[in-house]
Amino acid sequence: MTHAAHIALIDHELDGFHQSLVMYRQQMAAWYSRALDSVSHGLDMPSLLGMDRVLRAGDSQRSASISDADFATVTQCPMGGELKIESLFESVYDVPIGNIPVEVIDLDDGISTVVMLDERGQGSHHCAAGRRYQVRVQGEVSEEQVEALFASYAGLMGDLEQWLRAQWSGFKPHWERSTASAIGSGVLAGSWAAIREVWDSIKQVQAILEAPLNYVEQLGAAAAELAQIATAAPKVMEQAMLLASDEAALYLLLRTAMIWLDALPPDEIAEVAAGFMVSLLIDLVIGAVLTIALPAAGVAYLSLRLVKYGSRILDVAVGFVRGLLAILTTFMQAVDRYKAVAQAD
């Protein structure tokens, strides 16, 4: 690939970045079509496409595939005698799945009652305190509800694109005058296949956040700091966990990292072996998510993971994570405001 062709590739990727979740949804739809056409409907969805829906009933919660129209959870009626029920997407945004029926079954006498959830995905059922109830969802997710889910990421997508364009404005002149033979990192080649390849490794960040002390080798002293945050500032850790479990948000971060790596000036990436790029891609996204809980944790993770590749690569990676910190902080603050407004309505 010539320098001019590489510049054109990055420009093309940036111009199409606002369509990132369209491609994601197309892949979801393609998977569902294959599953429906299959003799076996028990095909395991790739975790990359695993956007889930959630049913909350009292103090119980159950997650299921976005395509699952029939699933249940069991809970105990609280002392007040009112069982609160909520249906929503598993997302950093509490996007509701409303206007659907749920069946509430008293497990002692078998009496069944249908509760219609409102447009906010909420409803309640008068129950006998202390008795156990099964709450079963009986409604599919509509196309309009899926549209509302993905529309909620427009702000994050716009901020990431703006940041990438600002980065590219600094990188592009280096490509225009470079005589280096190294042409890009190659991570954008076969991009969807590359994304599937690294996805399960990226999801490791959930395990790190759930039990940081199990990852002292990867985090160093930051492991103890993360564990302390989980106790002293659970809200902060909750935000990081939400981001780590949100496939759409992680997908956008991964696409950002892929474009950014391929856009880096030739002299920045010349010393990076091609086989190392996939590993670096994984580490960039994990480091970015860890910064939400503790900025030092992201840097510590990258330092311990990348030290063997030299200070230059480490500096490049830390620069990426620090560059995204403000965007992700703003994003999570917007999520909090969104939830506060929704709860006040």
Regions found by a protein language model. Give the residues of each.
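Short, glycine/alanine-rich hydrophobic alpha-helices that insert into or span membranes
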Residues: 268-298
